[in-house]
Amino acid sequence: MHDLLIRNATILDGLGGAGVVGDIAVDAERIVEVGEATSYGRTEIDASGWCVSPGFIDTHAHDDGAFLRYPGMEFKLAQGVTTVVSGNCGFSAIPRDPQADSVAASGGILAGLEGQFTDLEGYFAAVLERQPAINNVMLVGHNTVRSLVMGEEKRAPTEVEMRCMQQHVTDALEQGACGFSSGLIYRPGRYSETQEVIDLAHMASPFDALYTTHMRNEGDGLLEAVDESLQIARASGVHLHISHHKAAGRANWGKVRTSLAKVDEALAQGQRVTLDVYPYTAGSGRMIEYFNLENPSPELAEVIRIASCPAFREYEGRMLKDIAVEIGMSLPDAVQHVLMAPKGDRTICIQFLIDEADIETNLVHEDMMIGSDGIPDLRGQPHPRLFGTFPRVLGHYVRARGLLSLPEAVRRMTSLAAKTFGLSDRGVIAPGMWADMVVFDPHSIVDTATYDDPKQEPDGIGWVIVNGQVAYALGNHLAAGSGKMLRYRRCAYGDDD
């Protein structure tokens, strides 16, 4: 008798092939049989009429703090996500000074980091004590490392400081981080020259780990930023992963075709490059990074929505232009009012700056994965992508728009992501693989989270299995606590291309 048996499912194995009706047996956290079951299960799921695929892998998450604050990870589990990649945009839980203000250091992106850990080993131990619902693999962040060594200094590092930063990066990689991330739009990373990033990304090369980047510019300077990212990866000898690829601002719409052409040229020359995208026309991030406080842009302020604002909780979920009218201020004055208040620099905003056509251009690129980029501060009104990213791709862009076939979309969310991030024995339904799976209805799966009501779980997800345990069943979170902290190993499927 098997621990778990899923019967009569349309199996999408994650490799891009058509679905095949069959059964899946699980024992001791792993898939042991795929095809026609020859036994019974202690727990059985009749998946007639449902699809089963590998659990979705969120390649761009900021869940470092969420694993400590919300170990049930309901906002990810309910959309079929079984593994996330945290530590993105240059902000990671480690390395860390436990006495420092982690919220201030990340500008609110990581929320609070509880515990006395200082390195990846300690962080993983702290998370596992809380019995997380899903799996996590970590990047080590440039902004975090730089802040720990140099504070917010607007200058190049000294030789001693560089060696110290390199050691922090190496320590994290030795403990199992999957790569080095940068967020060059954010402070203090924005103060770095290209060579500094090369010198740090180079530490990932002996581990065959990744360099992931929130590029220096995603608007007017997008193409130059892509060139810089490719240069950094070439010079440091590592795989480049471009985060949340987009062209922000109406004047830049359509540029993604040119930036993707640059990526394709690099691929043709043998450089390893992958990307991810979120399926929304609005982004979200630290509001202070988008404005010149001395002269805030009224045009940008016009499209800003407040997601999380410790200084003015009553503003959360509202458009800044409406707040400005209410308090009798111009838009530039309202920007200063929010950002210059105590803790105002921790404000997270939503910006409506992306073209729908560009999202579709991104999604059809064969090396494009899906990353939510959700910022999990549930006290505010977060971007709906935190709850809806993966069902939105399958419901809107696959079923309604027909941009991708269902098997290909699943491949992007599973085996491609697992291979890219070195997640050994995950991302494919086959005997011997870890039993991370999602059972969903391809005819009804869709996001329900909106900007006005973002904390809504999607429709069409039936069951989610994490390391062989049923963690979510028909709308119920089962507190299985079966998530693992994953250590990087290149390459999951025995090759490197």
Residue ranges and their predicted role:
Residues 1-22, 26-27, 292-497:
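Active-site microenvironment of metallo-dependent hydrolases
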Residues 92-96, 109-235:
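Hydrophobic, small-residue-rich alpha-helical packing segments that form membrane-like cores
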